[in-house]
A protein has these predicted regions:
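Acetyl-CoA-dependent GNAT
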Residues: 1-56, 71, 124-128, 132-139
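Non-catalytic cap/lid and distal C-terminal segments of serine-dependent acyl enzymes
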Residues: 34, 81-83, 95
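Short beta->alpha transition motifs characteristic of CBS
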Residues: 36-39, 84, 107
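Conserved hydrophobic beta-strand within the GNAT/NAT acetyltransferase core sheet
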Residues: 47-49, 81-85
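Conserved acetyl-CoA pyrophosphate-binding loop and the N-cap/start of the following alpha-helix
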Residues: 55, 59-68
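Conserved active-site alpha-helix within GNAT-family acetyltransferase domains
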Residues: 62, 87-105
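C-terminal "cap" of GNAT-fold acetyltransferases
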Residues: 79, 86-90, 106-139
């Protein structure tokens, strides 16, 4: 979370982007996570998430990601949400697969002037809505 909040972090990066939505999660009045949906072209947005390090592994990432997808595909009306995730983050990759994201490729970026390897994943609105319908009928 710290890297996303610093002066040149994600919040600053997306501060002036048109059609950008930010969602936050607080516990006891403290920010513990936030997500961003930043429009990349009509009907599509990039997803980013940041969690406080002491809150990982507790299901918070899944909750806030699910709520963000619901807003993005529902209220906002997006048709595609895409993301990049570090290749060395297996828990996040598993979460995105469980939520219906599909692997589309790989990319490399410099993060803090060091090379980092990422997976590119996306989720289409139709696939998201179909998976929600299946989940509801299984209940």
């Amino acid at each position: 979370l710290d890297y996303a909040l610093r002066q040149d972090g994600w919040l600053a990066e997306f501060q002036d982007w048109p059609n950008t939505w930010r969602f936050s999660a607080e516990q006891s009045g403290e920010l513990v996570a936030f997500t961003i949906l930043a429009t990349t072209k009509v009907g599509e947005a990039e997803f980013r998430i940041a969690l406080r390090s002491d809150k990982t592994g507790q299901g918070l990432g899944q909750i806030i990601t699910s709520q963000t997808l619901e807003k993005g595909f529902g209220e906002i009306g997006l048709t595609r949400i895409h993301l990049i995730v570090r290749k060395n983050n297996p828990r996040a990759i598993q979460l995105y697969h469980r939520l219906g994201f599909t692997l589309r490729g790989e990319c490399h970026k410099d993060v803090n002037q060091k090379p980092a390897h990422f997976l590119i994943m996306d989720l289409q609105q139709d696939d998201y809505l179909a998976s929600r319908t299946i989940a509801k009928t299984r209940r």
